[in-house]
């Protein structure tokens, strides 16, 4: 089947239409390509196909620096120019707001701002995670492929911080060596690096039980020279694993990053944006939207380890910060101490069940990919907040929630700003500014 790719989807595929009008999601193609494709799924309203030959390459198709583009799932847009990536992400957000949020095109044109981004196309990630697999009887490490059931073994990744070119290869080599004489029980391996603090942490995720601590720490220290080596022990069913303990094997036992006006120290299980410069764009947009004053009260929902809590605490009289994940709560308390901030009430628990009793002048919410529960929107509306910033990592749930906010009626949308935190992928962050009517 000959197809011309019209656009990029919110996913790895290009979008085309067959002669019969059906939408076709095409693996291995980018917008502007003309390809020969083989149909792998023919549904009632759409088809899926994979590229067998590129008949005429798109002017936006590039030769990526990574040989695993199209094989590994980590950089699914790696063969598309950055300019085209930015345009596609902005367009995907716009179309999602129209399709799911039911916003009129003219509303979208008025609200959506030009996409913000850093200059770094590659080498921007401060964290990389590897999955174990067995190759020829030996444990090897890799990443989920385009086919998520497969692991693509790698010992380098151009997305990882380029100031640490040997870190990934050294860790992979050390663990491959150790696996020859020890059953490490590895479930995954995380590596975090900071070009600002020079911190390098290796986190080994394993079940509870016996573990060759001294050998692992010695071999990893000799190979990669990390500032921290930790073991994260988890238990429970595979789809509901939870952290039971973090054990320091060597070094500091945590990872440190300088961001915005302060410093954050994070334990291995805690979430932190993988693009530090991109996270600073988010902070700037949130502070610009809220314009917090020194006599005001702020609420930070789903606050994590303090990405927005810390800058709010420097600007406001008092902050109530709510977070359900235990390791992040502990990290937030430690980060407040490190930054000498004592005007924050840290509330451990679900954002709806533990919604702060205090009122708010400004409020920021940064929920997980699932977005906000309707109850959360009602609770936010019940405050006296003059301005609200909503940080989202999923355009679909964002569009759904924005529709709910508009229908609820307390707040009006001011602007919606996409942010490219993840070059070479289809993912996009968004910062939304609401103002009380």
Predicted regions and their residues:
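Short, solvent-exposed loop/turn elements at beta->coil junctions and helix N-caps
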Residues: 113-120, 187-192, 417-422
